Regions:
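Domain-level signal for Mg2+-assisted phosphodiester chemistry and nucleotide/NA-binding surfaces
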Residues: 2-120
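Nuclease catalytic cores that cleave nucleic-acid phosphodiester bonds
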Residues: 92-227
Length: 228
């Protein structure tokens, strides 16, 4: 029997029994291929241990987030669910295995899919899992990805239905989420202890000698929908 089935009322008509509430999920979806690429572009290469995301810290943040939502509705039965979606390239299983096992050891479920061609990404799998949890009962959705092409429309549709939706990522790559009126954006570096050391992101106090472009936080088109 699943957690959801256990939470449902098994005999609502029995005298003296308290009706148990159906569990609703606070779902975190981590788009590993997309965020690995984004982090690599910030670092200019593969991350060292100091700059790899700490999923135990992310899990604690998700637990705190769930507790905040539960406090707003004491009668709600909320359950956090942390998921990571990733591709496994041919010949990389042994290299990736310790990372996958570490994720599972801190409470993350991992959806792993062989990377055999350009069409074998995990976008459709993430969206299918989100749809499944929405059908079963979704209290809040948090998606860690910069892929606006895949996620913006479905996430905004969910948000318009009344379910809080947050996008986690790096603001340099997430103008679509920052520009949205219905999505909350959370920069990963603002989550406590997710990174052991500050990321080498370009700012006014860390400019290279040759100068650098500072990308806008929102697209210029967002002015059309904002008040003067």
């Amino acid at each position: 029997m699943t957690v959801i089935e256990e939470a449902q009322d098994t005999d609502a008509s029995a005298p003296g029994e308290t009706r148990r509430l159906a569990v609703r999920r606070v779902l975190l979806v981590w788009d590993a291929p997309n965020l690995d690429m984004g982090l690599g572009s910030i670092l200019g290469g593969r991350p060292t241990a100091a700059h790899r995301p700490r999923f135990d810290a992310l899990g604690r943040w998700l637990l705190a987030r769930t507790a905040e939502l539960a406090a707003q509705d004491p009668e709600a039965a909320l359950e956090p669910e942390a998921t990571v979606f990733t591709n496994i390239a041919p010949g990389s299983a042994e290299v990736v295995r310790p990372w996958v096992e570490a994720l599972r050891n801190v409470g993350f479920a991992v959806f792993a899919k062989p990377k055999v061609d350009e069409d074998s990404d995990v976008d459709a799998d993430m969206l299918a899992h989100i749809d499944l949890r929405r059908e079963q009962g979704l209290a809040a959705l948090l998606v860690a990805s910069a892929d606006g092409q895949a996620f913006r429309t479905p996430l905004e549709d969910i948000a318009r239905s009344g379910i809080p939706v947050s996008v986690l990522g790096f603001r340099e790559h997430s103008s679509w989420a920052l520009a949205s009126d219905s999505l909350e954006f959370v920069d990963l570096e603002d989550i406590p202890h997710v990174f052991r050391e500050p990321l080498p992101r370009i700012g006014l106090d860390s400019l290279p000698e040759e100068g650098a472009w500072l990308q806008p936080f929102r697209p210029l088109s967002s002015l059309l929908s904002s008040r003067p």
